[in-house]
A protein has these predicted regions:
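Acetyl-CoA-dependent GNAT
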Residues: 7, 16-22, 26-95, 106-108, ...
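C-terminal "cap" of GNAT-fold acetyltransferases
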Residues: 52, 60, 119-122, 126-133, ...
Length: 174
């Protein structure tokens, strides 16, 4: 990372998204997923309507610098559980990946959930993205099982989700 990138990282702020951010969120998610996930049949990962739907059931945390959206992550409180949250759609602008923004967003999401009194964070990782499972393991997530990949999403290769969980209060994942 050069000194300009270092200065920029100091000016990155994380905030909770509003409905008017939906178009920018859609753009950053589609850019990040398109760059990283070549096993999907070519199409956008998400559209503005889906982002708005997510915003009505959870929160997007945004990393931005001088009004430029650099990345986002989605957090949803699990209705069936009083102590669990779901994290998904972690996306960083392709030109900013490997800069620490993903970790910054993960830290912000975990802190947000801790502040709400939640004890566990759950995620689903596509098994074809082995490097992502490793990233989450380094952050304290452990595998808790597998689940089916949505049949309506076309893929070039068969795949499934690796279910992972992390205790937010120091307990073992369950």
């Amino acid at each position: 990372m050069n000194s300009a990138d270092s200065r920029e990282s100091k000016s990155v702020r994380v905030r909770i998204a509003q409905r008017e951010d939906a178009e920018k969120i859609t753009t950053v998610i589609n850019s990040a997923f398109r760059a990283a996930e070549g096993f999907f049949v070519e199409r956008d990962r998400i559209d503005v309507g889906e982002v708005l739907s997510f915003l009505s059931s959870g929160k997007f945390l945004l990393a931005e610098s001088e009004r430029s959206l650099l990345g986002c992550v989605y957090v949803e409180l699990r209705a069936a559980s009083q102590d669990r949250a779901y994290l998904g759609l972690l996306a960083v602008d392709p030109g900013r990946q490997q800069s620490g923004l993903g970790s910054m967003l993960m830290d912000a999401a975990e802190d947000y959930c801790r502040a709400l009194g939640l004890r566990f964070m759950d995620i689903k990782v596509v098994n074809l993205r082995e490097e992502l499972a490793g990233f989450y393991r380094k952050r304290g997530y452990v595998e808790t099982g597998t689940s089916a990949f949505p049949a309506e999403v076309e893929t070039k290769l068969p795949c499934h989700f690796i279910d992972m969980s992390k205790p937010l209060d120091g307990d073992k994942a369950t």
